[in-house]
């Protein structure tokens, strides 16, 4: 984990890759829980038997939004910010789902800092580049720019 002591250190890291998270398994249970939470019960995500018969992967695949929803976990496991009281998610840019994520596969996030600027109320708005890698695949599962505002 890379720990930044203050906002100035974050700003100095603009344009750099900070690191990659550990691999995280995307289990069928996680997919089912996400489907339940979001109401997205499309069979390609939750019907294991039908997926075995009809999908090229022969298994269910994770929701693209589940893949994206792992971004905060990836960032927190790679970057530490001292003296932070809280963080609010501000938005996302340029989200692309490039490779399906089969149930049981592993993902990790490769994190870079694309931009950092002062925000109101002693905040720092940071745009993170997140490349979600799928273990065993040359293409990433997802690429996105996630924006967060950190407050001290």
Language-model features: locations:
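Hot-dog-fold acyl-thioester-processing enzymes
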Residues: 1-89
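Short alpha-helix capping/helix-loop boundary micro-motifs
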Residues: 92-97
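HotDog/MaoC-like acyl-thioester-processing domains
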Residues: 1-13, 100-152
């Amino acid at each position: 984990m890379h720990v930044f002591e203050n906002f100035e250190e974050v700003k100095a890291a603009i344009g750099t890759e900070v690191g990659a998270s550990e691999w995280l398994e995307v289990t069928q249970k996680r997919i089912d829980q996400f489907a339940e939470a979001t109401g997205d019960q499309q069979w390609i995500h939750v019907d294991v038997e039908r997926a075995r018969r009809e999908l090229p992967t022969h298994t269910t695949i994770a929701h693209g939004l589940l893949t994206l929803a792992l971004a905060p976990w990836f960032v927190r496991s790679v970057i530490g910010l001292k003296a932070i009281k809280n963080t609010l998610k501000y938005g996302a840019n340029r989200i692309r789902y490039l490779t399906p994520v089969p149930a049981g596969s592993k993902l990790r996030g490769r994190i870079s800092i694309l931009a950092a600027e002062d925000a109101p109320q002693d905040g720092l708005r940071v745009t993170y580049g997140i490349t979600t890698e799928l273990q065993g695949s040359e293409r990433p599962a997802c690429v996105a720019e996630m924006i967060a505002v950190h407050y001290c």
